[in-house]
Amino acid sequence: MPTVPTRRARPVILEMTFLRACVTLVVLLAGSAWCARSAAAAAPLPGLHVVGHQVLDDGGKPVILRGVNRAGTEYACVQGWGIFDGPSSDASARAIASWHINFVRVLLNEDCWLGINGIKPAYRGARYRQAIVDYVRRLHQHGIYTEISLIWAAPGRRRATNQPGAPDADHSPKMWASMAATFKNDPDTVLAPWGEPQVNAHCLLRGGSSCSTTSARTKPLYRTAGMQQAVNVMRAAGYAGPIAIPGISYANNLSQWLAYEPRDPLHQLIAEAHVYGKNTCSSVSCFDQTMAPVAQQVPLIFGETGETYDASSCGSSNISTFLHWADSHAVGYAAWTWDTWKNCHALISNYNGSPAHRYGAFLKRYLAGLVAPPPPGA
């Protein structure tokens, strides 16, 4: 994920009954047979669901998820000045939908969601969770599916001020159980237990003390949690919908995804890649070699994509290549980012939806071009 700026001083969603006794038990027994039995007993909701390599809607029709990331909820709270960076109103959701978007990736901060490690009371715990739930509801009311993705976390008493290399064993399992309990009755939301791994495929799957990684700024070693545990925890907490599992190398490498796919008794996994210009895998030949085979087995989404990962270009040549390849392979995508930052990552210049740069203008035009014109006389 690109760096973010600092700032100076349709479904019914259940608000979480935080850390019930059963959820605590889920975390403690995440790898046990009890979890597997509980997950197997769950029945998929009649909303977004996976069949083979496709995502289907509640009517059984294939859905290609096309949209944007909405950054802010991962950093504003821990920086101490808000929950969102920009509005979260109904009007702002309507502006997103006006681009013919059907998918928004909403990003989470572990400390803010769990209410730990000294986050300001106004931006943590129940207030933070309810703000996310309310925003997701507004998006749904405008026909937009969502992905709820944990991306900023930290072990122990360290604050989640960045995106480290892997989820932490201290808090992430509790976070996953809480996310699942909150959204288990929302059939139009995908859950994503992690954003951009910086560990190898075995460590991403299994976690553990032998997979310790370092936090980007303070460099402490910490015990990691793996994607198999994430699937176990979410299923045992009652969530039966799709779970998006990233590739390695900042989610840019899917070459080992199928070999290290977590076991899901409900068979509701989505593969997630992040693709930017200047990434190691950012060419059609690389996509054909490493991503197309995955897309033939499970649904694939470019959970983040943009012109360049370092905001060095406001153009559209790379993003055009990425989206055309994705649409030719029934792969979804979410462009980075629906925010008004003063750099080339910003898709918009204001939250009414005015595009910024050639990059934003291209995406708006491209999505509009995918909408079939009405028949004559309609």
Indicate residue ranges for each PLM-predicted region.
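Bacterial N-terminal signal peptides
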Residues: 21-33
